[in-house]
Amino acid sequence: MRPSGRQTHEMRGVSIETGFTRHAEGSCLISMGETRVLCTASVEERVPPFLRNTGLGWVTAEYGMLPRATHTRGRREAAAGKQSGRTQEIQRLIGRSLRAGVDRVALGERQITIDCDVIQADGGTRCASITGAWVALRLAVNKLMKAGDIITDPLTDHVAAVSCGLYAGQPVLDLDYAEDSEAGTDANFVMTGSGGLIEVQGSAEGAPFSRNALNTLMDLAEVGVAELVAAQKAATS
């Protein structure tokens, strides 16, 4: 039995509230169970130096957690004077995941930066960030297209992410913190709405896991991503 009482293939409740902030070109608050992430998209009519005069756009991301997003207060990284390795890893993951679903020629020579700020963490913050980031990006692109700044839709597919793992020997979908902290295997799957794989991150916390177990986790991930894509569609329609 899972601590939450969910079935092995059952997601936590998912909600996406769009237009959560006033100034960003796109924004949403995504909730996956008790995990909540604010995602905002900011459009700039410039690109990094390595892309100047190429005609290509850029999508990047930054990630952070509020000090009391977790059970005990974490020090602000700004106060520490540097980002942790975990933060850098996650924000790079978010950026490259989103770019996998973007036609950068159609985007034009502009940059969209997605900020993902974890308000409350209960497992799966990187997956919630990716899923919510796509919604914020979708809303920002819609605004650019409505203004006539972009003619062809640069978003080629939905992008969403979910965690799966082996908890008490059972493959389970969408781990919360209680499960993640005790899981024998933990994996994150980033996928497109059409079922393409963008990134798979998996590790054994104890004994190695089998290829069959990985296949089972991937099957669960497909179920979860389909549900998340449906939530994205509902939020942006």
From Swiss-Prot:
Presence of the UniProt keyword rRNA-binding in the record: no
Tree of life domain: Bacteria
EC number: 2.7.7.56
Enzyme class: transferase
InterPro entries xrefs: ExoRNase_PH_dom1, ExoRNase_PH_dom2, ExoRNase_PH_dom2_sf, PNPase/RNase_PH_dom_sf, Ribosomal_Su5_D2-typ_SF, RNase_PH, RNase_PH_bac-type, RNase_PH_CS
Reaction catalyzed: tRNA(n+1) + phosphate = tRNA(n) + a ribonucleoside 5'-diphosphate
Annotated residues for binding of phosphate: R86, G124, T125, R126
GO BP, sorted A to Z: rRNA catabolic process; rRNA processing; tRNA processing
Coiled coil: none
Any matching Pfam family: RNase_PH_C
Keywords: Nucleotidyltransferase, RNA-binding, rRNA processing, Transferase, tRNA processing, tRNA-binding
GO molecular-function terms, A-Z: 3'-5'-RNA exonuclease activity; tRNA binding; tRNA nucleotidyltransferase activity
Function as written in the Swiss-Prot or TrEMBL entry: Phosphorolytic 3'-5' exoribonuclease that plays an important role in tRNA 3'-end maturation. Removes nucleotide residues following the 3'-CCA terminus of tRNAs; can also add nucleotides to the ends of RNA molecules by using nucleoside diphosphates as substrates, but this may not be physiologically important. Probably plays a role in initiation of 16S rRNA degradation (leading to ribosome degradation) during starvation.
HAMAP family, alphabetized: RNase_PH
PANTHER family on file: EXOSOME COMPLEX COMPONENT, EXOSOME COMPLEX COMPONENT RRP41
NCBIfam families hit by this protein: RNasePH
Family: Belongs to the RNase PH family.
Subunit and partners: Homohexameric ring arranged as a trimer of dimers.
Protein name, entry field: Ribonuclease PH
Organism: Dinoroseobacter shibae (strain DSM 16493 / NCIMB 14021 / DFL 12)
